[in-house]
Amino acid sequence: MDNPLAIFEATKEVSTIEMNAMVVQLQDRLMEMEQVEIVTLHKFLPGIYERTIIIPPWTVLTGAEHRTAYKVRLERGTIAVSTDTDVKILTGPFEFDAPAGFQRAGRVFEDEVVWTDIYENPDNCRNIEELENRLYVVPDIGLYEYRQLVKGELLCQEFGQQQL
């Protein structure tokens, strides 16, 4: 695919394998570009872990594959999001159940997006690294707040990580 953003312009459903390939290709292309700051907030409730990201307008991003099913709460903004076979445009407030096993891509429009993933956390773990390893297939490039591309080298840097 010459244009990795074509994932958001598709007018028909594709196979899960094709969609996954498009998301991975987009991720690879995005890593060649300057990385935008995406603020990540962590909230712990009894038996629940909430991970909120605040995505600036006009951002294109990819997430990690999830190991478990989870709930999504799109608190505000509009985003085009890949599913296993197509792309949906969602506007907050909106909630949905998300299955395990998929890596998603998103394209934010003119307003910032506040997106919260809600996970079961039966042992009330508060160790972010442990939770990430439980919940995600962490890509070699890391997760949102650890990505930064500088002069062709990946550096690990923590951006705006806060705990509520």
Describe each model-derived feature in a short phrase.
Residues 1-52, 143-164:
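A short, N-terminal "cap"/entry segment at the start of jelly-roll beta-barrel domains
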Residues 48-66:
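Conserved short histidine dyad/triad with adjacent acidic residue
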Residues 62-63, 81-82, 98, 117:
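Short hydrophobic/aromatic-rich beta-strand segments that constitute the beta-sheet cores
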Residues 66-85:
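Glycine- and acidic-residue-biased ligand/ion/polar-headgroup-sensing regions
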Residues 69-70, 87-89, 121-124:
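Short, surface-exposed beta-strand-loop junctions and turns on beta-sheet-rich folds
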Residues 109-164:
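Double-stranded beta-helix
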